[in-house]
């Protein structure tokens, strides 16, 4: 595999960081609040294609729309 997937623990940590006290989640891109993480994805801030690593400081939670809009930019 060219780019290894984000490990389960890293994903869980990213979602935990995006979780509000009421259990909802916030998209780091648009700021929209989601009641569950169903429509959210863990994203590399600096894409792996551009040298980004799968480390906590390079991960954020985005809604599908923001993640698709971002692509590898």
Q: What are these language model-derived features?
A:
Residues 4, 62-63:
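Helix-centric, low-specificity signal for extended rod-like, repetitive segments
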Residues 19, 32, 68:
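Residue-level marker of positions within ordered structural domains that often coincide
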């Amino acid at each position: 595999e060219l780019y290894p997937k984000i490990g389960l623990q890293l994903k869980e940590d990213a979602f935990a960081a995006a979780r509000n006290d009421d259990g909802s989640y916030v998209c780091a891109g648009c700021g929209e609040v989601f009641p569950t993480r169903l429509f959210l994805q863990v994203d590399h801030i600096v894409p792996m294609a551009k040298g980004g690593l799968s480390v906590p400081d390079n991960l954020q939670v985005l809604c599908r729309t923001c993640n698709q809009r971002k692509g590898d930019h």
